[in-house]
Structure formats: structure tokens, C-alpha cells
């Protein structure tokens, strides 16, 4: 197997037993595919699907004016090239966006006033600029105003229909009140609900409830529906008089079956239906109508068995006694045939009088509703009985009154309102998802997902399911099931936002079309694109889901992009979300990580996508499974949504299989419909793809996750995201095999776009000459510019280092440069350090961490943080501010780091208070004091009229200047520094251009030579005669640039040579054009905010060493704060003299139940031992005491035959030695989650490494030289330094700002605030009786304004007495009491 470039340099020994069947999808696929789907940039306008931006335009256009004389139609849209690339946008504070150009067509109609017929008069087409559309970078982020942002995907309730009950909470009796809710994607909500009297009501948009039959009356009757369909096919509508609503009879026949009572000579009888009588206790004897015999006694229960027996005995009709008929409900209107008089209406209850009257009238057939009050309840019939409306017209007007209370209803307006509510695609949209969900719930699969409004059948179907639930049939829905929650990703959120903007714009267009002369305008005169552009800007700038990217390290970036939030517009709020929504649900398996979620108020509302999960076209999360046939696992992988998965029996990935892929056990533990069951292999349909498919990326990076308590695993996965990139990254010895995928997909490490050979390498760029065949027009050179000391969003340092050497052959996809927190293409968030678990003088009490001085001395956990400071020179009323070195009242010492333009040099060491950029601001003429007047009179010179407003370094920051950027407004002359920066940038661009050109030339000349060598010359440059056959010698005499002029006698070859020349010239021209564009952008002035003439940004790199107060953590949730740095000689040491680096408290393990850290310690100890053995063998090899074969056999011994043959056997000798050198610190291993190293593996590794199998060693106390009483667990743990650094938190105030109202000092480091002396601290001083201390705390040190001044004056005089006055907060209290009408006055009393 061919290994990647970095894979040859370090091989991870994996303990995973389950082979990888399906590749893990790209980790930021969610973001990229969603936005691509929205923009459809790479699709030709004619071939774009009706989704995303295309659908938004299609749904809003065409726009007609009120008189319908003009129509504005949408033709197509196009995205042009962005003005600046990503890097320029970040530097200039711009948005990375492409101009959106929309082609619109204005059609003007002629309308004949007599006939009303329309004919086209004029068509005008035009491109209109509709603002800028932000583009996604290759890493799935957006650059908005120069900062990288991420749009978090939102989980929300899927559109469709949901059935639920109130869990018996509403009514005191505790009976369940069932309800159904139809939620559209856009439009009015429709709720159906039972009340305590078992009547069915409907609410529209949470308004007042109406009997559900009112809604049904308003729907089309059977005949009307058929007629409407027929007319629609003919292209006509219905007349008002032809529309009839549903009748009571239709409503009842839909919800209830019919039982016909027939009257014969012996009385009433009815067909025997065992199904209907199932479970009923017979009130009277059951008598066969044919024979008159009794077949069942009164009081007996009609069981299915008895029913079957009677049916087999030939029972067809049974006698109905008159008393049994009383209380039944009539199914149809019963009419006297002779007189036309209605005896009884559908739904009426039969009484003894009514039965007698019907018998008297000679009615022989009586249809009644099949309601038995056991299997079928009379809810709809009862609702019909209490409904005061009885016709379509009354129902429509009643609905109108509820929706528009206070407005006088007319039939037309009521009809228009009702149709607009649910049946008009402009106002109501179920969406494709909603339709699919509704079809599956109502079991109507024949309806296409393009039918996105409600149909009459849907409404009836929903009510029918609701009534059946009440009758005890079917199940209610679980709203936390992932089949009922879906994900809205970037594309969809953006689509909704853009639609809002376009609808705002539509109103304005309509008004404008009516107010202008439609014949003389062009489309762009009608369009004001501001609302659409503003909607986009608002969404990216201030939406709750558009977040400042967490860029602490590559993992935090990836996790942020894969986050799912239930909050945000149209979602839940923290306060209202209950426990059920936050809980882990069985359907989360393989879709949402059950571990990674924040601690605190957002727990469970913000989740992370599982590693293998993906989002399907409907927004449901899918998980992959392999199919199982007849107990044999196939390699066929399918993705299933939560709804589909419920139909299958799914085995775990770690089920034991034989070589043929069959299950070896008789009963296998499986999941089925949310439960765990044991089933035989032939019943299994699916099996998990991988054991790590159920956790998120961060959780999958924790080795031995299976041995950690879930709470600690949650902390571990959250804290990895806070790890600061260190100066020297080091990949973990004990990893999980996920490290490479994270480094690659996050974009931190640079991957090669094409196969090629490395041509040049330095710290800032890698130049690769492509060797794979490309189109003639494509360049044969790839230049990768590396980032150096760039500031991330969290002020950590982004810097990239090349891994390749000149001449290396690189395959496409190989990692060629490491980024922050990556080493050899693997994620490296922390360092491997030697840890001992033991107490040490109480310094590791309560999770404190004791570290050795070596860690600070060798910069093991040192990180670089980059702070950005900016200053603007504005144009003020009093004149322009100026950036200058000439600052009043400042000595030369303070200016030593500034150049002649007043800007600090790169490389200068600065400390708090140093000037970074000198700036002076004109100040107004202030009235002069007598002293100033005297000085002015004596010396006659005008005092300086500018004040110093220079940018100084704030307290707590000291470091080195790494970059300075100067931005000047267009038309403002650039200063010397700006010109110098510009020149350096142009030189860099020119070098890139020249290098690329040289490589292109070399490649072109090589191809040209290959074409013409060995051919006969017809004509050529000087020195070559016609008729010469070209050989290497002839060509080497000529300068390659003259080879172009050689003509040969083969026309076909000449044609190829000409094509080659043309392609080369085109590439060179393109190169030059690109260079000139960049230079032109550089030399052009910058777009600065209004009133700003010049802006300078200064970047300071701060080196942060580890110190007491910094927070550190392992990957298992074992966090702590550094308590003390101990001199090397005092640290406990091993018997070979090696000191341990960190001492942790053993008591941190048992109660926390994160045993994974102990297993990691043991395995890390074994890895280091094996590394030492390989290092020893390498030393022998270098001293020629061993051969390369010995080294290979050692590697084979360490890795085992399979890995050795697969990954190491094919390496060259120099690659073997490089690999061995990289393995000396320790052999890296992978222990994948839920499929990692067993205890036996760890023991075997320890034994192989020559360590004790207990993992414990004798430690010696560094202070006394005595060994400790018992052996101590020692090993290598991967520790992280977290972004909670004491330097960012420590803060002290001398004098500073005060709050305006209370006059108390402000709080917090950002405000340079004071320390709060709170209520409990006051109690402490009261308890000590420290009255004077307390008094000054509450007065002169806080908010006694006059007292503060007096203290200052006293200190200046050298006096140490002062008097406390009245605190300002007391005055505030007095004022508040006065505002309540209580006059409080202070009276002076002298005792």
C-alpha cells in the first residue's frame, strides 16, 4: 500500500480490530454542500434546479403592478468574480463577497378596454446589480468585515403533522386530552384538540377555538370537489353559486361506518358483524334472526373466539330489540317519500317515539352510525350537534370573525381569507419535507412532494387519526425523535433571509410600477436592491446563528462548523426548553453525539454532529449502516434517517463475525425501534459501520473514551477545543487514529492540489512543479504561500511550517506543511509529559498541578499570542489628526522604537506604556491661566496647540512587534512607511510571478525539445543550417529562447509545436495580468470608514510561558490549575535519574471515574519504552554496530507482522532511519474509541517495552534522596494548556473610571475596574469590629466623591488624617425614595 508523504515519516500502531469499511465523510461537508446547493454557482443558469437562490427569485417574481399592465419577470442570475480575495478581505476589513447580477425582463401589456383581452406591447431585458452575496471560503467559513464567521446549523421542529396529548395535566380528572398540530414551513398553524367534554375543536394560529365541524363545513363538498377538478382541467374556475360545502351527512359518513337495521315481519334485524361487536358485553340475548334461536346469553362478552364460532355456525343476521336501538344515531337524513317531509336528520339520536313513528310511516331500512362507545366514540357526532353553524356560508363568516375580530364580514372577504390561509401557495408552504412527513403519517404516499399546500383530504385525514387516537388506536408522536426534528443549514437559513429581503423589495417595486410611466422605464429604474442587500448584511452581521468563529485551534474550528443549535430565530429559548428536549434520545445514535454539549444553561440545546453523520436533502440527519443478508454482513453501505432506521434491526459494529462476515453468536445484541433486543442472526437487517460513528469528532479524539464517565468525557471533549497552539506541537503518543482526519479537513495543514516535484521551499512558501498531465491552458506550477504569525480570532498564533524538501515527489492530497497545532499532518493540541500520580506536600490538593522547572525552561508549554492594536487618524472639526514622530512633552527615550513616520519598527521589544504609533490631535483654544499669560508675555511663543493621543501598549501586554499595516484613504499621500510596506509586498508578488514563469519556461522548453529533437531543420536561428537533423548537441549550443524559431519539415509536429507555444504565451500573459491586478489593488488607496484619513494596525506577539494560575487539562476531563513550579532537583525522579515533569493527585481519579487517564498513562509508558529501544538500535546502526536489517527486525517486532508488511517493508533505507529517528521519543499508537486496546494489550506492550506490567515504578524523592514508601504509577500523558491564562485574568487598579450614577468604581478587567467589596466581605469586617477600615472601604475608597478628593489632597500635603462624608449611593437611594413620593432629608445635629 502506497503511504502518504507524512505517513512514511511516522507510523501509528493501531489496536483497532474492526476494519474500516466506509470512509469518513469530509468533516465540514455540512457547511460546504449546503451553501453550494444554495448558490449553484458552478451550474449554468439554464440548468439550475428550483432550489436555493433560484427558488427564492422564482417564488417572488413575476411581480405585476396593480392594474396588471406591466409584469417584471426573473430570467436568471449570475455571480461575478469577487473584488478581493480572502486574504485581502481579512487584511482590509472587507467582506468576501461576489456581486450578484440578476437579469430581469419587463413585459408591458396592451389591454383592450372593451373585451379585456391582453396583448404584448413591449419587452425589455436588463441586468440589474442586486448587492453583494457573501461567498464561503474553502474552509467553510465566511469573511465578514475582515473577521471569519461561521453560520451554525439550526435544529428545529420539522414541518408536518404532530399528534400529542397533555399527559393528563389540563383536566383535574387526569384524562388525556389529545391534540394534533399541522406545522407548515411558512404560513398559519392549524391545531385540532379535544376538550374535557370530548368534543373536537380547531384553532387557527392559536386564536379562539371553533368546533371542528365549522372548518369542515367550509371545505368543498364531494360534488363541488369533483366539479372543481373538472373545471381546473378545462382551465376555468367555479362560479360562487356552484360552490357547496360539506354536509353533515358527508362529515358523518367519512368518520363513521354504517349499520343498516332492516325491518321484517318478525321485527328489526341487522347483519351479524363479529368485528364490530368484539369486546362488547351483551346487554340482551343474541338471537338468530333466521331461526329465532338464542345463540349467546345476555351479560356474556363477545370474544374473537366466540365471534368466529358463531360465524362458522352460519349466523348471518341477528334480531335487534327496540330498546337496543334507542340511543343510536341516525346515519342519513330520513325523508318521507310521499310528502318530502324530513323525519329525522343525520346525527339525530333515536328515541322510542321516533322509532315508533318510523315504524308507523312504514320505513323498513334504518341506517345508523357504527358507534359502540367502546371501539368507536361519538366525538364527531357530538361536535356536530353543538355546532351552531350548519352551512358553508355561516362557517366561513364564523372563521372570518375569529381571524379578524371587529371587522364586518362579507362572504367574498371571508372566502378569500379562508382560501389564503391554507390553500394559496403564496401564503402557505408545507415545503417538500412537510409533505413527505404528512404523507408518511397519514399514509397517503401517492401525493407528490410538489403539492405544498393543504388539501381537503389532509385536513380530514388529520382529524380521523386524532379521533382514532382517542379511541385507543395508534400512537402519539415523540417530538424529540430525530424523524420529527430537522436541520436548517447555511443555505436554507440564507434562503429564508433573502426571501424576506425580496418580499420587502417587492412591495416597493409594485408601488413604483404604479406611479411611473410603465412604457418608458427600464427594469433597473423599478428596482431598489437595498432591502435585499440589507437582509443579507443583517443575517451575516447580527443573526444569532452567525457566530464569530472559535479559532483557538483546528479542532475548535471543525467543531464550530459541525455544531447544531436548537436556539436562534424560530427555535427554542434557553428558559423555556424543558428536560425532554435536552435529553439524549435513542435516535441520536450515530447522528448526534451524546457526549459533546456545553455545561451550563445550554446543555443539550447545542449539540455536535456525529463523525459519520450527514444531512440529507430534506434536512434530516442520516447515519450509515452496512446491509446484512441471511446473517451475513455485506460491504453495501446505506445511509438511513431516523424514521427509516426504526423499521430495521441493527447490530453493533463490535459484534463478533467470522472470516466470511457471518455472526458467530446464536443471539446478537441489536437495536430495534429504540430498544435493545437479543435476536438470532437471520433477523438482523443492518450493522453499524464503525464503533466511532456514535460520537462527535472531539469525543472520538479521546483514547479509552469507553473507560471514562460520561460527565468527564463531556468536559474532556469541550476542553480540547480550548487548547492553545504551542510553539512546538507534538502529536499524542496515545492517539485514536482520528488526528490526521481533523488536521486535513480543518484546513490547518496544507495539502497538495496536484502530484508533482518540490521545486523551491522556504519558510514562507512551497513551489511545486506539477507532473500530472494537465490541460494546455492550466498552469504547471502550484505555489503555496504559508501563513506566518497571523492572528486568529482568539488571538492565538497561526503559523505554518513546510514539511517537504526540494526534490521530494509529492502525491495529490499529501500534507506538505503543518499548521498551528499540527505535527507531521496530525492534530497536536498539547505535549506528551512524564506524569507521576502521587501527593506532593499538598501542592496538588483539589486538582492542583505541580510542574517541574524543566517544562518552563525548555518551553514545553510556551505559546505565542498575537494582540492587534489599531489607531485611526480622523479629520476633526479642529483640523486633521496626524500620525507623526513629533509628539509634545515626550522624551527621546520613549520614541526610540519609532521610525520617521511615527510608527513602531517590526522586531521592536515593547512593554506596557510604550508608544506604538505617535499621533497628535489639534486641541481648541482653551482660556489661558495667568501663569500661561505671563510665560507667553515673557517668551512671546505660542504654546503647542496639539495634544498627544498616541497609541500606547496597554497594561499586561509585552512582546515583539511582528507586523504593521498602514491603510491610507484614496487621494491621501502615503507616508514613507506605507510605501516601504507596499514595495516589499510588490517584490514578493514579483518573485512569485518570476518563479512561476521560470518553471513554466523549463517545462515548455522540455516539451518543445521532446517534440523537435531528431527532426530535420527547414530554417532556424543563426548557427543551425537547413537540413541538419537536430540532436542534443546542436540544441545545447543554442540558448533555449531561440528554440522557438526552429522550423522543421514535419507539418504535424510543427502544428503541435505551435499549439504548445500559444498555450505557453497565454499562461505567461495570464500570469502578468494577475500580477498587475494585484499591484494595482495595492497602489490604489483603501476604503476607510467616513472621516478616517489613515489607519495603522500593529500586531504584537506575546510569548506566554507556563506559570502558576494557568489552567491545564488532559483529554479525560482531568483539569487543574498550576500551583507551583518546582526546581528540577526537588522533583521526584526515576531510578535512572530522569525527573518526572508533572505530579498529579491520585485522588482525582476514583470519584471522577475517568479511568481512561490511567490506561493512557500505562500505554504512554510502554510507547516511550519501545521508543527508547528503537533509539538504542538506531544509535548502534549509526555506529555501525548493527545493520539496517537489525533495525527493520526491531521495527517488525514493535509493530507486528501485519502493520510492518503493509506500511514499513516497502520503505527505502534512508526512510527507515528517518522513521526510526521520529520514533525515538515514543512509538505512536492509535486506540480507537470503543475498539481500543484491551487490558491484555497494555500488559503485552509494557512487557515488550521492558517495563513492569503493573505500570508502577519506584520513585526517589528529589529533596531527601530517599525512595518513596511504595511504588508510584508513572507514564506519559498528553496534557493540554488551555486558553484560560492567568495573564489574561490578573488585574490591578490604582485610579480609574467611575460609574456615572453611583460614582462607584467600574468592575472588570476590560473597564480597568476595581475589586468589589461585597455584602459578605462587609460582614467579615463587622465581625472583626474593624470599624474604621470598614468606613473607608464604604466611603473614601468607593463613592464618597468629596471624601476622595480630600484624601488625595491630604496625601499630597503629607497629612494622614481625613474625614469620611456621605456615600453617593446613599444620595441615589434618597432620590429613588423621593421619586416614590417619600421625602427623606438629612438634618445636621451637633451632639
From Swiss-Prot:
The keyword Transferase applies. It comes from the Bacteria. It catalyses: RNA(n) + a ribonucleoside 5'-triphosphate = RNA(n+1) + diphosphate. InterPro entries: DNA-dir_RNA_pol_bsu_ext_1_sf (IPR042107), DNA-dir_RNA_pol_bsu_external_1 (IPR019462), DNA-dir_RNA_pol_su2 (IPR015712), DNA-dir_RNAP_su2_dom (IPR007120), DNA-dir_RNAP_su2_hyb_sf (IPR037033), RNA_pol_bsu_bac (IPR010243), RNA_pol_bsu_CS (IPR007121), RNA_pol_bsu_protrusion (IPR007644). GO terms for biological process: DNA-templated transcription. GO terms for cellular component: DNA-directed RNA polymerase complex. GO terms for molecular function: DNA binding; DNA-directed RNA polymerase activity; ribonucleoside binding. It holds the Pfam family RNA_pol_Rpb2_7. Its EC number is 2.7.7.6. Keywords: DNA-directed RNA polymerase, Nucleotidyltransferase, Transcription, Transferase. The RNAP catalytic core consists of 2 alpha, 1 beta, 1 beta' and 1 omega subunit. When a sigma factor is associated with the core the holoenzyme is formed, which can initiate transcription. Belongs to the RNA polymerase beta chain family. DNA-dependent RNA polymerase catalyzes the transcription of DNA into RNA using the four ribonucleoside triphosphates as substrates. This is DNA-directed RNA polymerase subunit beta. It comes from Paramagnetospirillum magneticum (strain ATCC 700264 / AMB-1). The gene is rpoB.
